[in-house]
Amino acid sequence: MDLAPTSPQAQARALTVLGLESSCDETAAAILRREVDGSVTVLADRVLGQNDAHAPFGGVVPEIAARAHAEAMDGLVSQALAEAGLAVADLDGIAATSGPGLIGGVMAALMTAKGLALGAGKPLIAVNHLEGHALSPRISEPLAFPYLLLLVSGGHTQLLIAEGVGVYHRLGSTMDDAAGEAFDKTAKVMGLGFPGGPALERCAQSGDATRFALPVPLKGKPGCDFSFAGLKTAARQIWDGLDAPSDQDRADLSACVQAAIARALSSRTRRALAMFVDRFPDASRPMALVVAGGVAANKAVRAALEDEAAAAGFRLVAPPMKWCTDNAAMIALVGLEKLARGQIDGLDAPARARWPLDGAAAKSDPAIGSGRKGPKA
């Protein structure tokens, strides 16, 4: 991909950034290099998952995750540097997820980055994890601003307009649970294993997506907000009402839940596509609908969104599967973008459990995306 030079300093020399990620249950380190002509190369990309540690509990246990991040991070950094053939002294900056996420996990990447930056005298770039997902397709292909972004994962479901690095306008957000939460919790109820989303998708392959009637969240309601709590509850009630459920019952309910989530995402995205066209009538065609985050790896969701995009004259853009879930390559990319603009942070940069991607969300009253736990990132 190419990053357009943004300053004389950015054009003068190549930049190499180490990115670190530990916001949930993947520990990751990656190194990206930006050449003078704007092209970007992934020099190293390491990810260590924690599925085996969390599987007995059916979900991510924050304390276990934080401990695993702390134990793994130094080794992954060493592996990434060795893979790239570099030393810390060769880097131009250290980027790390600073939030949002599980605070104990976030601190593992951020504190490691601070130590490296201080010891080597390198700039620190504190990265919003959500911006990493927002820009992740740009790791592998040119993607011009503005574009419509559907950010969909286990913790977030948002529709935003991406107008530039650090410039985002939210059109809608979940009012309760994220789409990935509905996937994961339904999978847990049916005993499909962890992680739940991919397990449910595999189970759905042999299921009948028309067998069970599930509600379409916010059907007919204006706006671009989402709601998945009711769908999650309805799926559980259907499961609890089955007498000695069979493997086929599991497959059918998995297929129905997957189809309902895909319909909900595509119907709200349809509204956002129209709003994007109204806002940018002169944008170059075809315009881009970007889907990013862990749920972007779901093939049924991608297919539904591809249909919506094509009907509206957009092209669907998604990162490669390996960069849909949490990774450090996207963190390093944001680090490159910000470093090229001279946007660096002090060693007092905080770890944040919540950090809205769009500044207006944190100031709105009531907060955009408010739910049972308050303003969501």
UniProtKB/Swiss-Prot annotation:
InterPro entries from the UniProt entry: ATPase_NBD, Gcp-like_dom, KAE1/TsaD, TsaD
Gene Ontology MF term list: iron ion binding; N(6)-L-threonylcarbamoyladenine synthase activity
Cofactor binding comment, as recorded: Binds 1 Fe(2+) ion per subunit.
Necessary cofactors: Fe(2+)
BP terms from Gene Ontology: tRNA threonylcarbamoyladenosine modification
Main localization (coarse): cytoplasm
Binding locations of substrate: 151-155, 184, 197, 298
Keyword entries, A-Z: Acyltransferase, Cytoplasm, Iron, Metal-binding, Transferase, tRNA processing
One GO term describing the cellular component: cytoplasm
EC number per UniProt: 2.3.1.234
Reaction catalysis annotation: L-threonylcarbamoyladenylate + adenosine(37) in tRNA = N(6)-L-threonylcarbamoyladenosine(37) in tRNA + AMP + H(+)
One Pfam family matching this protein: TsaD
Annotated compartments: Cytoplasm
Function: Required for the formation of a threonylcarbamoyl group on adenosine at position 37 (t(6)A37) in tRNAs that read codons beginning with adenine. Is involved in the transfer of the threonylcarbamoyl moiety of threonylcarbamoyl-AMP (TC-AMP) to the N6 group of A37, together with TsaE and TsaB. TsaD likely plays a direct catalytic role in this reaction.
Record family assignment: Belongs to the KAE1 / TsaD family.
Name listed for the protein in its UniProt record: tRNA N6-adenosine threonylcarbamoyltransferase
UniProt organism field: Maricaulis maris (strain MCS10) (Caulobacter maris)
